[in-house]
Amino acid sequence: MRSKVRWRLCWENELELAEHIELADFFRMTYGPTGPFNAKPFEGSRSWAGARPELRLIAYDANGVAAHLGLLRRFIKIGAIDQLVGELGLYGVRPDLEGLGIGHSVHAMLPVFGELAVPFAFGTVRPALQKHIERFGRYGPVTILSGIRVSSTLPEARLDKPPTRIDDALVIVLPIGRSISDWPAGTVIDRNGPEL
């Protein structure tokens, strides 16, 4: 049985405080089961963990926020090449709706990438989500790259940690305006900012 959802595409500056609070609750509930550390950035009314998205795709149902995907245009450095991407992040589906196919509805975001003139969508996920992303790939062109180190700055400068961290996450690339063969080769990606 599929949940009936209504999708809303909105720019970050269109969100009201009450919506940030509702999204923060959603992220604590969605990311909390993966570990309390993952829910910590969403304390209070903060509805982002690292970099703040510029555009959000939010699904609502009768119980509130059902799913979310954030987007941020940025240049990442792959080897010596600066590559414009639409970074995807802050992805989540409410736990009671997992497995119902709602996550695949995020393909509604793909035409938006064309409007934003980004040649690739880019994101990173932990290896435990590889099967989920592979299923997502059945509905459109998705390339999963492993063995790539991704450098990101921390969301806030801290005295007790270095200013950057390096992850060995899976890299997700969706070709939008170009062929995947145009994606630069390299084993290190520098976000030049915090993860979305």
From Swiss-Prot:
First and last residue of the signal peptide: none
* Localization (cell): Cytoplasm
Does the keyword Acyltransferase feature in the UniProt annotation?
yes
Q: Which domain of life is it from?
A: Bacteria
- Return the GO cellular component terms, semicolon-separated: cytosol
* Entries under InterPro entries matching the protein: Acyl_CoA_acyltransferase, NodA, Nodulation_prot_NodA_CS
EC number in record: 2.3.1.-
SUPFAM superfamilies given in the database record:
Acyl-CoA N-acyltransferases (Nat)
What broad class describes the main subcellular location of this protein? cytoplasm
Q: Which GO terms describe its molecular function?
A: acyltransferase activity
Alphabetically sorted, this entry's keywords are:
Acyltransferase, Cytoplasm, Nodulation, Plasmid, Transferase
Protein family according to the UniProt entry: Belongs to the NodA family.
Question: What is the recorded function of this protein according to its Swiss-Prot or TrEMBL entry?
Answer: N-acyltransferase required for nodulation. Acts in the production of a small, heat-stable compound (Nod) that stimulates mitosis in various plant protoplasts.
Its name, as the record gives it, is Nodulation protein A
Per the UniProt record, the source organism is Rhizobium tropici
